[in-house]
């Protein structure tokens, strides 16, 4: 397929109605969530597809960085859920297959190259992506760092070992495993073993979760990680359906509905995380596309998040980096929770 046809095909696929509901970064925002007519994005969003315009509109690369356990990270981290096929697109079951078909190795490389050019120096994803990350390092000369969620067929400890062996700079316990252990099984020994064994690998070790109860459980049992990977997003969008089942876990540890991982009001999350001195990487900040980064990022950072992990297609990276640069234009914004990292 020639470049012109490829550009058109990509444009048509990504600007369809389903994409507007699911895209993880800037183009994900749909004005339907504000009870207004949906507007098809044009202009800069489309021109970003053109190879010669990859970095068009970038004010400057990121300047906001901080360290967790000696590892320097950009305050904005590239999320890998979409690349791995975990798209979180409400009830549209086809979408996982769609993003898997879209994200060939070459498109993953393109995403990484643009992220690095914009100053985003870290990808956070699953061990399933180790192959393509290592290929990118080897064949493209990329330097992007890798944080692993350790979700692995042999368990999270084996996932941590495999991840570090394949170049991970940091690891954390996948939120699904952590929520199941804390909220469903009340198994504090799970966390103690994970932390003890993973720390033998010599990298920072975190705990991920969707439920605030998981953080509280770990603190109560003195299972303290080097960092938290905790969700936060608005819960007043029209499809939230808040009610008695707003936060119920199935035996698997997953929520009753897709994208219903964190229906805890954001302020409640911010208030509790303000009591924790460990660095906090916030994720699902856009709620799988219910909010634009211009609205969601400032709330998350000023509410207490030290870093944001956000899934971004190649054409979304520039806009998202510009948003973060604006937030940190005059240094660290004032907020109730001290900055960590």
Regions found by a protein language model. Give the residues of each.
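N-terminal secretory signal peptides and thylakoid transit peptides that target proteins
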Residues: 2-21
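C-terminal segment of N-terminal export signals and the immediately downstream linker at the start
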Residues: 28-74
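Glycine-rich phosphate-binding active-site loops on the catalytic face of alpha/beta enzymes
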Residues: 177, 232-234, 303-317
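Catalytic alpha/beta core domains of metabolic enzymes, predominantly
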Residues: 208-297
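C-terminal helical cap(s) of enzyme catalytic domains, especially alpha/beta-barrels
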Residues: 317-337
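Acidic (Asp/Glu)-rich catalytic clusters
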Residues: 133-141, 160-167, 222, 274, ...
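Conserved, mostly hydrophobic/aromatic
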Residues: 78, 205, 280
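Active-site-adjacent beta->alpha loops and helix N-cap segments on the catalytic face
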Residues: 129-136, 156, 179-193, 267, ...
